[in-house]
Regions:
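Outer-membrane beta-barrel porins/channels
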Residues: 19-33, 38-39, 106-493
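Outer-membrane beta-barrel translocator/receptor signature
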Residues: 36, 48-57, 63-139, 227
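Bacterial Sec-dependent N-terminal signal peptides
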Residues: 1-22, 493
Length: 493
């Protein structure tokens, strides 16, 4: 019996790409995890303003404040992710914590011109989260060997062989520098005796046999967030037109682990099981600009905001481990200690939001935000000419425009405020069911120099999870039932 283990820890740069359209969606998606009042009104503040988290929605929101204030929030997510793969259902529970903090200074009656008020502020909050923990398990007639076979298509056998004077480590490094990610996957499978090569047909074939289906288990754990720091300037002209500018700094950090296990091959199969692990560490930074307007028309307010693309630079580190157990061989372990290192850029699509709000007798407020984003405008790039042409072409073909909706309302009853809202975010990938529907609610108390707010949301997030990007492309249906709680305290001065 033979165990082939390939494990990589030595850091080196890879001449190739492993990013795909799912990465483009993740880097472009905006969840806007703000303070309690912002959440409880469905993140709908595009024409209302006057909220620290609302600055991230519309830069003109800052000059709606009458007094300066600072505030902070604690956000707690309770998730239950249910997966359905080939009729087998699993569920995993998890809890995650986030935060929000901001401050804004308001200057009124400054000079004798038509600039009645202006403000400077800074706000920090999570723009998106990458925390997930779920299990996909079931019987399948397709094997992960197809992933390796697809990556081996067109690969020359002499390039993934280990010759005299070479090592697993040196060949793997050479493949990364010269051919990239796909050839490395073929190398893993060939050296682990999952794939063999037919000299007559000049093609690779799998040594695994599975006529009666396979048992598969895929565990996914990810921790990370896209944090956004916003520097805001806003003013009001002639007591009618609020306008503002945001300069945004983005920071992305993600740690993810994907463990795929497959067994129950035929009794005469040369392969007994496959255990394939991928650990990915992503670190990125970016910059974006926002412009916003809010125009007052009697009891109504009309808002408009434009978000520029976000220009990101990324550094990824990929650790891989492939273990294949085969019959009729003595144990053997190969451990070259390699880390794949990728440097690349991503430009997210721009976004436009139109808002309408009304305030009735300073008691009842209503707001509607309609946001448009063209996901196909996302673009990967690197110093390698043409490296991302096929990936970007795939984005243009498969990602569509989306329209998202946010509705919020607030009723003031003295020091008590009652709030509610709806969030609807749609999926740019037309071939999948993948959207977020959230119902939000909350309440708050306004004291002489402070406020205390509580916000809650219930969400059903539907998504199809595809096991691999090629070959084994079977999908599991995921439903994330999430309950989010936020508590916020603000000081007014």
């Amino acid at each position: 019996m033979r165990y082939i283990v390939l494990f990589y820890f030595l850091l080196f740069s890879v001449n190739g790409v492993s990013q795909n359209l799912y990465d483009a969606i993740n880097y472009s998606f905006e969840e806007e995890i703000g303070n309690a009042r912002f959440l409880s009104m469905g993140n709908s503040f595009g024409a209302l303003g006057g909220n620290l988290s609302a600055i991230s929605k519309n830069p003109a929101a800052g000059s709606v404040f009458e007094l300066s204030r600072s505030g902070g929030s604690i956000v707690i997510d309770n998730n239950k992710v249910e997966s359905d793969f080939k009729g087998t259902v699993n569920s995993v529970n998890s809890t995650n914590t986030y935060w929000q903090a901001g401050i804004i200074y308001v200057f009124k009656n400054y000079g004798k011109g038509k600039i009645n008020k202006f403000s400077f502020g800074i706000n920090a909050q999570s723009h998106n989260t990458f925390n997930k923990d779920f299990l996909v398990e079931g019987r399948n007639n397709n094997s992960v060997d197809s992933f390796f076979l697809n990556n081996a298509n067109g690969v020359r056998i002499e390039n993934i062989s280990v010759n005299s004077g070479e090592t697993i480590q040196s060949v793997y490094r050479w493949l990364g520098n010269n051919y990239g990610y796909s050839t490395q996957q073929a190398f893993l499978a060939y050296q682990a005796y999952l794939l063999n090569y037919d000299e007559d047909k000049k093609q690779f074939y799998s040594l695994a046999k599975f006529n009666d289906g396979l048992s598969q288990r895929n565990e996914i754990t990810s921790v990370g967030s896209n944090n956004k720091i916003t520097l805001n300037f806003s003013s009001i002209y002639n007591n009618k037109l609020h306008f503002g500018l945001n300069l945004n700094i983005h920071e992305i950090n993600i740690e993810s682990r994907n463990n795929f296990f497959e067994n129950n091959y035929d009794t005469d199969s040369l392969v007994n099981y496959i255990d394939f692990n991928n650990d990915l560490y992503i670190k990125g930074g970016g910059f974006s600009v926002q412009l916003g307007l809010i125009y007052l028309i009697n009891k109504f307010r009309v808002g408009f905001s434009y978000n520029s693309p976000t220009w990101y630079s990324f550094e990824d580190e990929l650790y891989q481990k492939l273990e294949v157990q085969s019959e009729d061989y003595n144990p053997d372990i190969i451990d070259p200690n390699i880390i794949n290192y990728y440097e690349y850029n991503f430009r997210s699509p721009s976004k436009t939001t139109i808002s309408l709000a009304t305030i009735v007798k300073n008691m009842l407020a209503l707001n509607l935000d309609i946001t448009s984003k063209k996901y196909s405008n996302g673009k990967f790039s690197s110093n390698l000419n043409g490296a991302y042409e096929s990936v970007n072409s795939n984005l243009n073909r498969n990602l569509s425009d989306v329209i998202d909706y946010n509705i919020g309302t607030e009723l003031k009853l003295g020091v008590l405020s009652l709030r509610g809202g709806i969030i609807r975010k749609n999926n740019p990938l037309e071939s999948e069911i993948n959207h977020i529907e959230s119902t939000t609610f909350g309440f708050g108390f306004e004291f002489e120099n402070s406020t205390l707010d509580f916000g809650f949301s219930e969400s059903n997030i539907q998504k199809n999870y595809q096991l691999f990007d090629t070959g084994l492309t079977d999908s599991a249906a995921l439903i994330n039932k999430r309950f989010r709680s936020v508590i916020t305290y603000n000081l007014i001065f």
